Amino acid sequence: MKRHKIHHSADIVGRCKKGIIPFLLCFVFMGYGQNISVNFPNITVERALEILRNQEGYSFSVKTNDVNLRQKVNADLQNQPIEKVLETIFQNQPVSFEIEGKMVRIIKAPEKDSKQIGSTAESKKISGRVTDKQGEPLIGVSIIAKGANKGTITNIDGYYSLTVPDKSVIQFSYVGYDTQELKLGKGNILNATLQEKINDLDEVVVIGYGSMKKSDLTGAVTTVKTEDLPMAANTSISHMLSGKAAGITSVQNSAQPGGGVTLRIRGEASTGAGNEPLYIIDGFPVGGSQVEPAADNRYSDFGSRNPLNSINPNDIESIEILKDASSTAIYGARAANGVIIITTKKGREGKPVVNYSANYGVQQIANKTEMMTAEEFMTEANKFAKEQWLYNNRVYPYGNTNPSSIKDPIVYPYDAKDIKNAGKGTDWYDLITREGMIHQHNLSVSGGTSNLKYMASFNFFDQNGVVRNSDFTRYTGRLNIEHQINKIFKYGINATQSYIKSSNVPLGTEDFENSGLINSAMSYDPTTPVRDKNGDYAQSDRMTTVPNPVSMLEIDDYTQTKRLLVNAFLQAEIIKGLVAKINIGFDDQNGVRNSYIPTTTLYGKQEGGKASKSMAQQFDRLLEATVNYNFNIAKAHKFNILAGYSYQDFNNEGFSAANSQFFTDIFKYNSLASGEAARPTVASNKSKTMFISYFGRINYNLFDKYLFTLTARVDGSNRFGENNRYGIFPSGAFAWRIKQEDFLKDVDFLSDLKMRISLGQTGNSEIGNNAFEYYTAAWQQYVFGNSINTGTAKSQIANPDLKWETTTEFNFGLDFGFFNQRLSGTFEYFKKEVKDLLGYRSLKSFMEVSTVAEKLKVPV
């Protein structure tokens, strides 16, 4: 029953004469190993394999349908080879096994079929190549013809040749990959691509400053793979997360392509500070919004820009969502709203692999609002006039006045002839909307050697929104490099450059003359034509303070943003398990916004045309140093200890200028000096925020059953008041892998059962600059002599006691899986309490400032 790859050693050694590297590869394939001693005291096959895994370090790949894991084994084996041990474990079972170092693949032995093996059966020689999904060759893949005692393995380049009976089914199997079966056709070439097999519980999950197996997690962490997301139809990854993880809500808060997205993890807790989660991109913490130049434009309410706009979704490998205090406390004062860790794709060993994809899609407004026709509008206007007359004169049902006693009759705005000849009128909503379009192109190349791996990509994304003139164009490039210099040192660079151009439409939510495009279209009079007899935009006689919706499409408003995000690391494995690492990076964002409201619009006519230009720059720097020690004490005690330091600063600078009263619309925003406003607007700003942090984490694994995590972080920031510059954020967690207990090990249908409990504190540092005293000069005027002078005035009172909001969170979780994780799920219960909420207290009326920021006393 036994079949080993050593049976093919003659062919392999022949190939090994060509060089030392192939020889070493072949040596691995022969599965050389030392003898072992082990005792199986009448236990199940499953328990015996677990003993070999824990005691000798072997890994096994086996299909539960191919073997009887409940069969008993009773043997005491001393100084025996692994082959003998496996034969004893699987005694009287029709299996064979392949041994590669410490990896063992157990498969059902092929059944002999006399019809296929007979001397009269037709046979032919086939050949081919076996690769993984990246196109890289797989070495040592087992290839057999089902029903025939014929088999071979692939060589160093993934090629094979084999003589098999005609019309055979060829089975390709390899440790760590899904077995594939292909039916032999008329040709002699048969290639196969194997898919990597990942056990759900052995999946590696990225956490703060590290990674660990999913089975060892003590916190509430959800992983989202990008293959599960609709890549082709979305500007940013934020749009795609809705419905992909429990406790996550994602709401588009603007019709503007690339506009803001409200992303919340476990709801909103803050009333005065921010509720955005912290984003970590390849180890670099980024802010909650994209840099946005100010706009002196009353119609600029499109929501904050999405911070992930500049990231190509096709570059993302995985997304981890950290929800509870156990998983987020490592980020301290910035983690109260949860953490989203984004990991981009890396290169793989092998020849260059080039991927290209293109997508085209359309967008339509679902449930498009049906607008009144002119005839319907007139009819309803007459009904309203009558209802208003009844109300004003207190006629039933608004009173008991006799209608005949009223002198003033009802005045209807439209007569029957007007209504009959009205027709459909103007559908303003239809005129400002359209069928949207999205198209994009992605090109990537990846590859490398065992020491140097790379991934480079380029993406072009273009979207025309469903509201006319709302456009979004993005170019992104990425380069990820990892280089293992020697056995000790390794470095890597993750860099992405992006350029975004947005055409902004006036989407304000105000009323009357401040109405945005959609508001005005929803309320405008359908009896009014788009243009009057003179060819100018018509203004409704009934709605003199609401702008003509189509005229607002004449507004020019463009934003251009450039971003360069670079993060590099150098790490050294000082001794086995002890790794020191330094991260250094920067995030450089520059934005320019130009806007012009022409005199053809209602507001532009009042202002004589209004132009503005603004610029904004945000430059963030990061320096982090960590030491991670992973070690075992005996085989029962496993430790992972992390200690680190972090410094990050955020440097913001902006400038804007605006003018009005232009003699022509031709120059738009390109000649601010030609405006004749009495007082042009000029503004500038500059700020710097710093964080200095110390953090640590201890993970303790006892018997692979009982998991403990202790985490703490100390954050200091100049954003906090001088009396509260530093905060401490601790957490603790415990997890019990109940499935590993003896009373559940033999329950076959239950593949996982784990209980998690955590308690900890995190902070919300998004309190703005409310802790400090502010003075402003703009518009602070006084008369001295015969001239008007500009002075300064206090606009904000300092509060030296102001600090972060503190969230205390308890979390209980239960993870379960059935039928080898074919069915799995998680139950979570959590309770949050937030204290030191940011609020504002009213001051005495005689003071120059009306309110001061302070901490609310009541927790929520």
Model-found features: residue ranges?
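Short, polar/charged loop or turn motifs at beta-strand boundaries
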Residues: 36-41, 72-78, 129-133, 220-243, ...
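Non-catalytic regulatory/gating segments with a bias toward low-complexity or hydrophobic composition
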Residues: 143, 241, 248, 283, ...
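Cleavable N-terminal targeting peptides that direct proteins into the secretory/outer-membrane pathway or into
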Residues: 1-125, 165, 178
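Short, acidic Ser/Thr/Gly-rich low-complexity loop/linker segments typical of extracellular
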Residues: 148-159
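Extracellular/periplasmic, surface-exposed regions of secreted and cell-surface proteins
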Residues: 276, 439, 474, 480-489, ...
